[in-house]
């Protein structure tokens, strides 16, 4: 019965543990995570880790018009650039490169030492990110909608790139 504490449709692991899918996050799950993650962090990292997500938002404007954005976050000393988008009419003018540089600078202020990102596997994306000091670390076949993506890393986060186009 729902709410009775009995597993519903669960897959037994052993005599006293069963796994099941539940709908939505429950306070009991949040409490479990709050109690168990610090222990797991100490085992793995030797200390507790601050997993607070700190958003990073950078925008480019031409007058009052939004010309581009870089969106991401810093978590546990690592930045992840989730989105970089420049208006079609503003591409090729250095806007994207400047957004990435400002994103990395802000991420460093928030304690990040490196930045990861994923992008489509195209020659243009490769040239753009490699020119900004990112290094290819993984290929992700058929990642989104059957298209290949790439995973890039920039470390150190703040560096001379030789250009920001």
Predicted region positions:
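Conserved N-terminal entry element of GNAT/NAT acetyltransferase domains
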Residues: 1-25, 157-165
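Acetyl-CoA-dependent GNAT
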Residues: 19-82, 87, 100-101, 106, ...
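A short, internal acetyl-CoA/4′-phosphopantetheine-binding micro-motif in the GNAT/acyltransferase core
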Residues: 84-91, 120
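Conserved acetyl-CoA-binding loop-helix of GNAT-fold acetyltransferases
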Residues: 92-105, 131
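Conserved GNAT acetyl-CoA-binding A-motif
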Residues: 107-120
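Conserved catalytic-core motifs of GNAT/GCN5-like acyltransferases
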Residues: 116-118, 135-151
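Helix-turn-helix
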Residues: 125
